[in-house]
Design a protein with these regions (language model features):
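Short acidic/polar mixed-charge low-complexity motifs
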Residues: 47, 76-78, 129
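Hydrophobic residues in beta-strands and at strand termini
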Residues: 43, 51, 74, 124-125
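Soluble periplasmic/extracytoplasmic beta-strand elements of cell-envelope proteins
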Residues: 8, 12-18, 36-40, 69-73, ...
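Conserved, short, structured surface segments that act as functional micro-motifs
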Residues: 95-139
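Surface-exposed, glycine-biased beta-strand/turn segments
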Residues: 1-66, 99
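Residue-level recognition of beta-strand microenvironments
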Residues: 18, 60-61, 85-88, 106-109
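Zn2+-dependent peptidoglycan hydrolase active-site motif and core
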Residues: 51-87
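Short alpha-helix capping/helix-loop boundary micro-motifs
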Residues: 43, 88-91
Length: 139
C-alpha cells in the first residue's frame, strides 16, 4: 500500500505484547494460545491516549473482552482501534480529531487482558485487515 500521512503512537511506553496475527501467543488471562491482532503498550493508569492521525471517530463502545474502545477512521485510509480505556468520555461518534488530540485515557477495562500491567491495546487496520502498527509507525 501507499504510505499515508505519518501516524504516531497513541501512548509512549514499553511494548508488552507484540502483534502476532499468524503465530499464536499465550494469554495468561484467557489461559489459552491465541492470535494477538494488535499491540499492548505499557502505560500508567490515566495516561492520555492520543489520536494516531487525523480522522473521524466512528465507534465508541464497550467491548465485552477489550473494554472501552474508540475507533477512528483516519483520512489516510487506516483505521485505529484503541482499547482498554478508562472511559468513553473524551470523544463521541462523529467527532473530527487531529493527530495528537486526546481520545481517552488508559484504564483497566479489557477483561481479556486484565492480568497484564496497565496498558493500551492498539489495533491498526488497512482495508479491514489488521496490520502491525510497528511496520507503519516509526519511533
Amino acid at each position: 500500500p501507499t504510505p499515508g500521512p505519518a501516524l504516531i503512537w497513541p501512548v509512549q511506553g514499553e511494548l508488552l505484547t507484540g502483534f502476532s496475527k499468524d503465530a499464536l501467543v499465550y494469554s495468561e488471562t484467557m489461559g489459552q494460545w491465541q492470535a494477538h491482532e494488535g499491540v499492548d503498550i505499557a502505560a500508567a493508569l490515566g495516561q492520555v491516549v492520543a489520536a494516531p492521525a487525523a480522522g473521524t471517530v466512528t465507534e465508541c463502545l464497550e467491548d465485552m473482552l477489550m473494554g472501552y474502545t474508540v475507533v477512528i477512521r483516519h483520512d489516510s485510509g487506516y483505521e485505529s482501534r484503541l482499547s482498554n480505556l478508562a472511559s468513553l468520555n473524551a470523544v463521541s461518534v462523529g467527532d473530527r480529531v487531529q493527530q495528537g488530540d486526546t481520545v481517552g485515557s488508559v484504564g483497566q477495562s479489557a477483561l481479556s487482558e486484565e492480568k497484564l500491567a496497565p496498558h493500551l491495546h492498539y489495533e491498526l487496520m488497512l482495508n479491514g485487515a489488521q496490520i502491525d502498527p510497528a511496520r507503519v509507525i516509526k519511533g
